[in-house]
Design a protein with these regions (language model features):
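Conserved phosphate-coordination/catalytic loops
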Residues: 55, 87, 126
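Active-site-proximal flexible loops/turns
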Residues: 48, 82-85, 125, 154-155
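Conserved C-terminal guanine-recognition region of P-loop GTPase G domains, centered on the G4
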Residues: 91-170
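Conserved NTP-binding/hydrolysis module of P-loop NTPases
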Residues: 71-97, 190-194
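Flexible, glycine-rich phosphate/dinucleotide-binding loops
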Residues: 35, 57, 122, 151-152, ...
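Conserved G1/Walker A P-loop phosphate-binding module
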Residues: 1-83
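Canonical P-loop GTPase G-domain recognition
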Residues: 2-10, 140-143, 148-202
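Short loop/turn segments at strand-loop or loop-helix junctions that form parts
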Residues: 74-79, 116-118, 173-178
Length: 202
């Protein structure tokens, strides 16, 4: 899959023609081991999600970007979902969102959050739902990304379970960001398209 063509065709068209934005700013969060780094690397077509590759924005958040790619990702570093870290992360996100909105420049806003859940884990905890709802309350729409989808049947069952809880999410996207031995990668295009739907109107 040519991610560069995929992103440039699906996203740049929306950005340039409809919104006049230069970048889509995405917050990404999730437990350790859910595949955030693989997802980020797939979006950028490069191994950027490594220690030291991002630029620190706050203690809990780092910015990952690549010249020529119309995406900026704010990665919640070390987000382990315990109450203390969750509270601190929410505080930092609120501060970041408010600072961006002060500029009154849509290009600076946080346009959405990708919240990642590992499909094979078959778990979605109350603390995750609360975190998502807190982010949505800031006016940041949330796309729930089911990662590591080696079995679409199992992922669909988990998605149904999550939807019954009615978290404040815009949509759910199933993704396998990197080819496995048996299953080719998929879902990045759909994730990009869902993200484009959340961009502000011009």
């Amino acid at each position: 899959m040519d991610y560069d063509d995929l992103i440039n065709q699906a996203m740049k068209q929306v950005i340039n023609e409809e919104n006049k934005l230069q970048h889509v700013n995405i917050l990404i969060a999730g437990k350790s081991g859910v595949g955030k780094s693989t997802l980020i690397n797939a979006a950028f077509r490069a191994d950027l999600a490594q220690t030291g590759m991002g630029r620190p924005v706050t203690k809990e958040i780092q910015l990952i970007e690549k010249p020529g790619v119309p995406i900026k990702i704010y990665d919640t570093v070390g987000f382990e979902l315990d109450k203390k870290v969750q509270k601190r992360t929410i505080k930092e996100i609120k501060k970041l969102a408010k600072e961006k909105r002060k500029n009154a420049v849509p290009d600076d806003d946080i346009h959405c959050m990708w919240y990642c859940v590992s499909a094979p884990s078959d778990r979605f905890e109350d603390i995750e739902e609360n975190f998502i709802n807190d982010i949505a309350a800031l006016g940041i729409p949330v796309i729930l990304v089911l990662t590591k989808v080696f079995s679409k049947e199992a992922a669909t069952q988990l998605e149904a379970t999550i939807r019954l809880l009615k978290p404040k999410i815009h949509s759910v996207v199933q993704v396998l960001a990197k080819d496995s031995e048996l299953v080719p990668s998929f879902g990045i295009k759909e994730l990009v398209e869902e993200t484009c739907e959340l961009l502000p109107a011009s």
